[in-house]
């Protein structure tokens, strides 16, 4: 069962490892990231970083989409992590049954507009996000579980 879908350019780091995995009782983390899926060193580093009792899978976006039927059958409490909005939007659209997406960290870049202290979106990312919003997906910004959710749907 998917407990959390999060966009965070840092992928697996302290906030995710200590705060989110505990608050959501996460048993499996699925990282969907095209670059990471082909980087053996980064995959090994992520496996060493994750909590010992949590399973970890790393897939490209297309591979993850091909595995959607199997992901839907998993009984673990799952967190899905993306490093960027584009890959998240592609997967969430294909999955079809994701109600919420947490925007945890999207870095500042040329042409990006600031939506919170840690979330900056380009016009293309705003458009991707608006498409998800139009499909009924609630998008929110929240760094850690103890902080208040900021509803991104109201800002885009």
Predicted feature locations:
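Short amphipathic alpha-helical segments and helix-helix/interface helices
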Residues: 46, 88-92, 129-130
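Ordered, amphipathic secondary-structure segments that act as subunit-interaction surfaces
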Residues: 59-104
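Glycine-rich, aromatic-bearing surface loops/beta-hairpins
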Residues: 94, 99-156
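A general structural motif
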Residues: 8-12, 60, 121
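Short, ordered loop/turn segments at secondary-structure junctions
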Residues: 33-36, 61-63, 85, 105-108, ...
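Short, hinge-like loop/turn segments at secondary-structure boundaries
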Residues: 47-49, 75, 119
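Structural motif
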Residues: 2-5, 27-30, 55-57, 77-80, ...
């Amino acid at each position: 069962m998917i407990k959390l879908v999060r966009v965070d350019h840092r992928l697996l780091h302290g906030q995710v490892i200590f705060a989110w995995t505990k608050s959501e009782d996460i048993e499996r983390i699925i990282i969907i990231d095209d670059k990471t899926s082909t980087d053996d060193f980064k995959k090994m580093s992520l496996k060493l970083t994750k909590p010992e009792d949590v399973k970890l899978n790393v897939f490209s976006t297309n591979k993850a989409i091909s595995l959607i039927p199997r992901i839907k059958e998993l009984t673990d409490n799952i967190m899905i992590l993306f490093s960027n909005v584009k890959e998240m939007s592609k997967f969430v659209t294909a999955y079809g049954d994701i109600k919420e997406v947490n925007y945890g960290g999207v870095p500042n870049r040329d042409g990006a507009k600031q939506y919170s202290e840690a979330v900056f979106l380009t016009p293309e990312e705003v458009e991707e996000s608006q498409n998800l919003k139009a499909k009924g997906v609630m998008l929110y910004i929240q760094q850690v579980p103890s902080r208040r959710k900021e509803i991104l749907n109201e800002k885009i």
